[in-house]
A protein has these predicted regions:
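A conserved hydrophobic position in a structured secondary element of the catalytic/binding core
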Residues: 77, 86-87, 163, 193, ...
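Non-heme Fe(II)-dependent double-stranded beta-helix
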Residues: 1-25, 32-126, 130-135
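A structural signal for well-ordered alpha-helical segments within the folded catalytic domains
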Residues: 89-93, 144, 186
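Catalytic core of non-heme Fe(II) oxygenases with the double-stranded beta-helix
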Residues: 120-185, 223-233
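Residues that flank catalytic or metal-binding motifs in active/ligand-binding sites
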Residues: 68, 78, 109-110, 142-144, ...
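Conserved double-stranded beta-helix
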Residues: 169-192, 196-198, 202-271
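A structural signal for short, well-ordered beta-strand segments
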Residues: 110-113, 146-148, 214-218
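Short Ser/Thr-interspersed hydrophobic loop/turn segments at strand-loop and sheet-helix junctions
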Residues: 114, 152-153, 196-197
Length: 271
């Protein structure tokens, strides 16, 4: 790790143009203070039963996902608090600036709670936009990713690996060890990174700390999402959600108002 690299960071309330300029340049940004202690406690309370039931994954050195990790997906049904944080004003500001360049509406791509335990190895470096391999890197703006720190993130306990500037690299450039930075941040902070930025979960070198984070990524409204939100949340529950939340969950289509059968899914929602 190149310890000389300063983590680009700011606090809640920073001018959104300044935030996005930093994010565009560095490929990543930490914003502190986005979730309150009460919201963090609520997320823990809502997800604890699911994480307690999740099997701690065994490790396979060649597998994409490291072992010694608990993973829970489909969070929008399981955590009402995360549904609110999913449309946090800072998320909306950065999402609009990054994604509306290539769409009219953008949507949640995937949600997952991750607890990285002692003994976990570094994850393979990858790009969120590798999901859409029709384009070769560097790609157009396709994804904005975020990692919410539910616990403290440190270089030792599994802080996310980031390769600054890699969103501008060609596909065949390989990150060297000195180019990798580990994101450190307090609970309630959010790490944002661009879909083209190389990153991966960090190794947990501690004896007894579990690094707890929630990943929410967003993509263009006309792309197929990695996680099908229409199947992840009961329809009756979706009916009662605010319009902006329904839009982020893909209930309002992006392209010419046309969805499956030329109907926007919103025709099923209340006026």
């Amino acid at each position: 790790m190149d310890v000389s690299v300063e983590i680009p960071s700011c606090a809640l309330g920073e001018d959104p143009e300044n935030m996005y300029a930093t994010l565009q340049e560095a490929g990543w940004l930490v914003v502190t203070g986005l979730a309150t202690p009460a919201e963090l406690d609520a997320v823990k309370s809502e997800l604890d039963p699911y994480l307690a039931a999740a099997e701690v994954e065994a490790d396979d050195s060649e597998a994409f996902y490291p072992g010694h990790t608990r993973r829970v997906i489909a969070l929008m049904h399981r955590s009402p608090t995360l549904r609110q944080l999913m449309t946090h004003p800072t998320v909306e500001q950065l999402g609009d600036r990054h994604l509306l360049q290539n769409c009219k509406k953008w949507q949640l791509n995937v949600s997952a709670a991750l607890q990285i335990g002692p003994g976990a190895r570094d994850q393979i470096l990858h790009r969120e936009e590798d999901l859409y391999d029709y384009w070769a890197p560097p790609r157009p703006n396709l994804i904005l990713a975020s990692m919410w720190a539910i616990s403290q993130f440190t270089a030792a306990n599994g802080g996310t690996q980031i390769v600054p500037g890699s969103h501008r690299w060609a596909a065949d450039r390989v990150a060297q060890p000195h180019e990798i930075v580990r994101a450190e941040m307090p609970p309630g902070a959010v790490l944002f990174w661009l879909g083209g930025t190389l990153h991966g979960g960090g190794a947990n070198l501690t004896r007894d700390e579990w690094r707890y984070g929630v990943i929410l990524t967003y993509t263009l409204g006309w792309l197929r999402t990695e996680e099908n939100q229409h199947l992840s949340i009961p329809f009756a529950e979706a009916l009662a959600l605010p319009e902006k939340t329904r839009t982020r969950l893909g209930f309002h289509t992006d392209y010419n108002g046309q969805g499956l059968g030329f109907y926007d899914p919103s025709v099923l929602l209340p006026d």
